[in-house]
A protein has these predicted regions:
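The leucine-rich repeat
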Residues: 8-10, 33-43, 64-66, 86-88, ...
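Consensus "Asn ladder" position of solenoid repeat domains
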Residues: 6, 27, 59, 81, ...
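Leucine-rich repeat domain C-terminal region
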Residues: 265, 277-333
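Conserved hydrophobic position(s) of the canonical leucine-rich repeat
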Residues: 7, 19, 30, 51, ...
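LRR N-terminal entry segment and analogous cap-like coil->beta motifs
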Residues: 1-10, 15-33, 97-98, 112, ...
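Extracellular/surface-exposed low-complexity segments
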Residues: 330-353
């Protein structure tokens, strides 16, 4: 069923047993998921047991969420819609919670075990509303979710345990709180974008995520330590700048193919010897505006020099500007400054105060 860019409101299509696809891109006539409109109405696509694809990108869908009673649904695309949140099943909600508490209620996907892609972008949700913790618990086939609500959310990210097929986890610039997920058991994960939230605590260790290519957790409120990367051989991009991370820079030997390590504007003080010596494809390292003590800074420079000796190359940028401990600018020792000069002569752009 195709009505993209026609201006036709989303019709009632209940009990269409062979219907597989509904496509209504950029339909600007206001519609809801219910007929008649409102919470007392009936879900327009109930009884469509073979419905697989719901493409409503840019459609002016307003109002509350339905429970998607379509067991074959694979794709729900609700990017740039005007859904306000709430709805779903109102029974069995946690004590003290109502449907209006949620930008996306916890139970709307409980019949969607085949769901692969869930995309939702809306600026119309209520400020301070949250994501249901159980949202994806029935979605064992989920590969890709993208949720963006323009900084209006609060509360934590949904439970992601048991999502062994998950490849992309995007929930950026939302205002989410709590701690970062470890993606344990999600060994297919490729891309993580959780930047621009209010996550606190530590960055967990990431283990056996052999497909992980990029991990973006910058611009949060992370104030703990950093875990290790263990058997993350395909990680290229790690961004965790603009947080309040403390402790030591972790050992990156378990992510030897890292290209970009961006950690400026944190409170890191220590360095684990060997952490960077084996990251031989590194192109860009930014540790500016941290709190390393001189011994840590010296060891770091020693390892960068070892890195170059192991894999001679130019074009690498290293930013170590404004390293201060207790407010005092930290300068490397003479031996390490000599190594910096050698790296610069080899074509490395090493920035120091």
């Amino acid at each position: 069923f195709y009505i993209s860019s026609t201006g036709i409101p989303l019709p009632q299509l209940r009990n269409k047993p062979e219907l597989k696809t509904i496509e209504a891109y950029w339909n600007r006539s206001s519609s809801t998921f219910f007929e008649p409109a409102g919470a007392s109405g009936t879900y327009k696509f109930s009884g469509c047991n073979k419905l697989e694809n719901l493409y409503l990108y840019g459609a002016n869908i307003t109002g509350e969420w339905p429970v998607f009673t379509n067991p074959q649904l694979k794709i729900i695309d609700l990017r740039y819609t005007s859904i306000t949140g709430g709805g779903g099943k109102t029974d069995a909600l946690p004590g003290g919670y109502s449907a209006s508490t949620y930008a996306i209620p916890p139970n709307i996907l409980e019949d969607c075990s085949e769901l692969q892609n869930f995309w939702f972008i809306s600026s119309s949700v209520a400020s301070g509303s949250g994501l249901g913790y159980e949202l994806f618990e029935s979605c064992s086939s989920l590969r890709y979710f993208n949720i963006y609500c323009y900084g209006k959310l609060s509360g934590g990210i949904p439970n992601l345990s048991g999502l062994g097929n998950l490849q992309y986890a995007y929930a950026y610039w939302n205002g989410l709180t709590g701690t970062l997920p470890s993606f344990a058991g999600s060994n297919s994960i490729y891309g993580v974008q959780l930047q621009g939230n209010k996550f606190t605590g530590s960055i967990p260790s990431y283990t056996n995520l052999t497909n992980l290519r990029f991990l973006y957790v910058h611009n949060n409120e992370l104030d703990g330590t950093m875990g290790e990367f263990i058997n993350c051989n395909n990680l290229y991009y790690f961004y965790a700048h603009n947080n309040r991370l403390v402790g030591a820079l972790p050992d990156f030997s378990g992510a030897p193919n890292l290209r970009y390590i961006i950690l400026f504007n944190n409170n890191l003080t220590g360095y684990i010897g060997g952490a960077l010596s084996g990251v031989l494809r590194m192109n860009y390292l930014d540790l500016s505006n941290n709190d390393f003590v001189q011994s840590a800074l010296n060891q770091l420079i020693d390892d960068l020099y070892t890195n170059y000796q192991t894999s001679p190359r130019g074009g690498v940028t290293i930013n170590l500007k404004n390293i201060r401990n207790n407010g005092v600018l930290v300068i490397p020792s003479e031996e390490q400054l000599d190594k910096v000069d050698q790296l610069r002569n080899a074509g490395w752009n090493v920035k120091l105060d």
